Each structure stands twice: as structure tokens, then as C-alpha cells.
Amino acid sequence: MSRPGIEIILMRQLASYLAVPILIVDRERDLLFFNESAEPILGRRFDETGKIHRGEWTASFRPTDANGLLLPPEEQPLTRAIDRGEPSYRRSWMTGLDGVARVIEGLAFPIATRESGLMGAAGIFWEVRERAAVPPSLAQQAASRPSRSRHAVEVILLRRLANRLLMPILVEDSEGKLLFYNPAAEPLIGRRFAELGPVQLRDWNDEFQPTDEDGSRIKVEDHPLSVARLQQQPCYRRFLYQGLDGVKRRVDAAAFPLLGLCNRHLGAVGIFWEGSR
């Protein structure tokens, strides 16, 4: 049995700390691990299932589209992340091992480095629920909270992992201040993080001027990172923006709340990639 790479080990350690449903597959698409937060959706504890081989977990969870048709493997986010080496997002129905069918949204991204190549993929998924508007008072409370995110073990693990990956990742604290983005994100941001340092998301929003594909400006409270941080719900969105290098780009972005041990609210994580035209 081959030993998992350090990135797989770090991803599993990080997932164990987070209150966000996460599962990990290897490059053969064998299910290596899912965390405690994923157990209510998958309908079984990982201790009861252990590693699930390729094909078995697809047959067990029976992902289907809105019409009830089984999704072929090539349309499933984890398979696309492995086969195409790029992130993939999809909304679908999934039946857990408890027999309950749920509507879920899922993002999968490859776990890959320049040194080791593709080692597997991580899936972050959530049950679809209606999102309420963020009350202004909640946004003010979040902004006034003292931030201790930078020194949290979850953030330290995430930064160690992100700095090794080819996937662009951005992290902000519970106040909406940028904690870091990894080297893979620098070409999309248009500047190295060492040259920029911490900024507030509101200032960030003004600088990048994100818009929908029809040109409508995206309000800061509607940005995926804001939704994830303030509503503590994952969020996916496609938008256009102008980087700090002056280049206009079209990206897909998914953000999820950085909820740590004891449900500590540490901020939000953004994963983004250039969308197809």
C-alpha cells in the first residue's frame, strides 16, 4: 500500500478540525476519508465505512440530476477534478446511506502540486437551504469582533496546505480582513501577497469591481466570501473582475465558512478558478 502524500495528510488533518462537510479521494477515486461534519449527510460514520473503493461509493450514494437520472461518472465533480485536473461545481440529488435523499451543492478540486503531480481530490459539499438576507446588525457585530483567526490551528494547517497546492485559495478572518492567499492565486489577483498584506473585503471589493456576467455590480454583502462569513453557509458564484494588474478575468468562485473546533467562527475560505468562456 502506497503512503499518502503530505498534502493528503494535511487535507485530512484540516478536515478533521472543520465543521464543514469534506471528503477526500485518491487519484484512483477511492474514498479515503470523510469528516464528522459529512456524516449526517452521508448517513453513516466514517468509522463504520472505512475506505470505500472506486465505484462503490457512487453506487451507494446514487447522485442524480433534477429529473432523477443517475449522473454518469464524467459529470460528477470529484471525477472531473481527477480526470480534468480542475475544480468542478454541481447541484444534484444524493441519497445517503441512511436512505434519505437530499439536494446538495458540491465543489471538488484537485489535490496537486508541481513536485508530486495529482494525488487526489477534495470534495466540499452542503445541503441546499434558503439563504436569508444578512441583517446590518450582524455585519456590524462581525466587524467589531476581535480576530484571533491568524493563530488558530485550523488557519495554520490551511495555510500550510494551500501554499503547497496548485489551486488558488484565499482566506479572510471573521472581520472580513484578508489573512492570506497562496502563490497559486497570485496570477489571478495580479500581485504577490507579500506586496499587498491585509485588506478589508469592502476595500477589496472596491478595488476589483466585481460584476455579474450582465455587467451588474456585485454588492459586497453578496460576494461569496461575505455570504460564507456572515451567513456561515457555503456559496458559489460566477463573476467578472479586474485584477490588480489591470487584466479583466472571468472566474468561478466557491466560498465556505471557516468553522473550527467547538464551532469557532474563524472567517471564510475562497477557492476560485478562471471560468471557461
Task: Walk through the language-model features, giving the residues of each.
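PAS-family sensory domains
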Residues: 42-43, 50, 189-190, 197
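N-terminal capping loop/helix in small sensory signaling domains highlighted by a polar->aromatic N-x2-3-F motif
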Residues: 35-39, 182-185
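PAS/PAC sensory module
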Residues: 75, 89-93, 100-106, 122, ...
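Sensory coupling linkers of modular signal transduction proteins
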Residues: 114-152, 260-277
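Output-coupling edge of small sensory domains
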Residues: 109-111, 256-258
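Sensory modules in modular signal-transduction proteins
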Residues: 2-27, 148-174
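Terminal output helix/cap of sensory domains in signal transduction proteins
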Residues: 48-94, 196-241
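Conserved hydrophobic beta-strand signature of PAS-family and PAS-like sensory domains
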Residues: 31-32, 178-179
